[in-house]
A protein has these predicted regions:
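Histidine-centered nuclease catalytic patch
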Residues: 152-172
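Hydrophobic alpha-helix feature that most strongly marks membrane-spanning transmembrane helices
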Residues: 54, 73-76, 147, 166-170
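Generic detector of bulky aromatic hydrophobic side chains
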Residues: 32-35, 140-147, 169
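Noncatalytic, beta-rich nucleic-acid-contacting surfaces in large DNA/RNA-processing enzymes
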Residues: 90-94, 148-150, 164-165
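Short, solvent-exposed coil/turn linker segments
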Residues: 114-120, 148-149, 155, 166
Length: 172
C-alpha cells in the first residue's frame, strides 16, 4: 500500500509540474520546462524537480528550476560525462532531502551543488556550436530568454533548426 501510494503521489506530481497540467504554473516555468524537455537529451533533471516539489510545493519552485537548469545545461555543454552529471543530480537530491522550509535559503546558496565551470562554459559558447548536440537547446534557450512569457511555448514533439544562420557569414 505504501509503495502504491508513493507511486501515485509522484505520478500526480509528474503530471502537474512536468507534463504541465497544473493551471497555476506560470508561463515562465512552463516555458523553461518545455525547452528542457525538448532540448535535453537526458531526463536526469526531472527527479530533483519532482522531489523539490514534493517537499516545498510552489515555494520558490521557479527559482529552483532555473538553478537546476543552469547546472544541468552548463555541465552538458562543458562536456561533463553522463555519469558525473547523474552524480550531480543525486547530490542535489541529497541536499533537498536535508533541507527544510526553515533553511530553504541554504539550498539556494549552496554553490557547491549548483557549481558550473563558468570559464569553460564561456569559452565554449563563444566558439563554433554548429553541429554540437547542444546547439538546438541553446537556440531554444535564446528564444525562451528573449520571449516575454505571456504565452506558453508549444511543445512540438519534433523541432528542427535549419537555415537559421549561415555557417560562414560574410565579414560585413
Amino acid at each position: 500500500k505504501e509503495t502504491l501510494d508513493l507511486i501515485y503521489k509522484y505520478s500526480e506530481i509528474f503530471d502537474n509540474i512536468i507534463d504541465l497540467q497544473d493551471a497555476s504554473l506560470s508561463n515562465e516555468y512552463k516555458n523553461l520546462i518545455t525547452i528542457m524537455k525538448m532540448g535535453f537529451r537526458s531526463e536526469d533533471w526531472i527527479p530533483p524537480v519532482m522531489y523539490y516539489y514534493s517537499k516545498f510545493k510552489y515555494e520558490r519552485l521557479e527559482e529552483f528550476l532555473k538553478l537546476l537548469e543552469f547546472k544541468f545545461a552548463g555541465d552538458w555543454i562543458c562536456g561533463i560525462t553522463p555519469t558525473v552529471r547523474l552524480d550531480a543530480m543525486n547530490e542535489i537530491l541529497k541536499a533537498i532531502e536535508k533541507t527544510t522550509l526553515e533553511n530553504l535559503q541554504e539550498l539556494f546558496e549552496n554553490n557547491e551543488i549548483f557549481k558550473v565551470d563558468l570559464e569553460s562554459l564561456n569559452i565554449i559558447l563563444q566558439g563554433n556550436i554548429y553541429g554540437k548536440q547542444y546547439a538546438k537547446y541553446l537556440l531554444l534557450k535564446i528564444e525562451y530568454l528573449m520571449g516575454d512569457n505571456t504565452v506558453h511555448l508549444s511543445n512540438h514533439k519534433y523541432i528542427t533548426v535549419e537555415h537559421v544562420l549561415p555557417q560562414n557569414p560574410k565579414e560585413d
